[in-house]
Structures are given as C-alpha cells and as structure tokens.
UniProtKB/Swiss-Prot annotation:
Disulfide bonds: none
The organism's place on the tree of life at top rank: Eukaryota
Region entry Disordered, spans: 1-92
Record keywords: Chromosome, Developmental protein, Differentiation, DNA-binding, Nucleosome core, Nucleus, Spermatogenesis
UniProt protein name: Sperm-specific protein Phi-1
GO cellular component: nucleosome; nucleus
GO biological process: cell differentiation; spermatogenesis
Amino acid sequence: MPSPTRRSSKSRSKSRSRSRSASASPGKAAKRARSKTPRRGKKRARSPSKKARRRSRSTKKTAAKRRKRSSSPKKRRSAGKRRVRAKKKKKK
C-alpha cells in the first residue's frame, strides 16, 4: 500500500510545479510582446503631465519643507536613543 500513495503525492507535486511555471511564463511573454508593440504616441501624450508634477514637487519651497520634516523626527529619535543608553549605563 505505501507505493501507490507515494506515487500520487509525487504526481501532485509535479502538477503543481508545472502549473506554477506555466502561469509564470505566459505572463512574461505577454509583457515582452507589449513592450515591442509600438505605443509611442500614447507615451508622448503622458510624459508632459509627469514632468509638470515633478517640477511642482521639486520647487524650492517644497524642498525646504521636506528638509524640515525629515530633520525633526531624526533628532527626536536620536535623543530618545541617547536617554535609553544613559539609563543602561547608570544601572551597570
């Protein structure tokens, strides 16, 4: 009896591996086919809006705000860590 059960488990594992590879390969092939298809006109139409968004993000005012935001939480974190370290040293 043990031999037929083993065979069935093997066949199941094989079918699983096949299904995974099969599901992965056609998706990749489709992506490759899409990249080769000429859709240049649509891309050109999209690009100016993206550029405008990037410009608005990288203005001096927004950059300054970002710097302030990024610097303040870092300072708080480092201060908290220092306090913890100091407490540990005192205990020793």
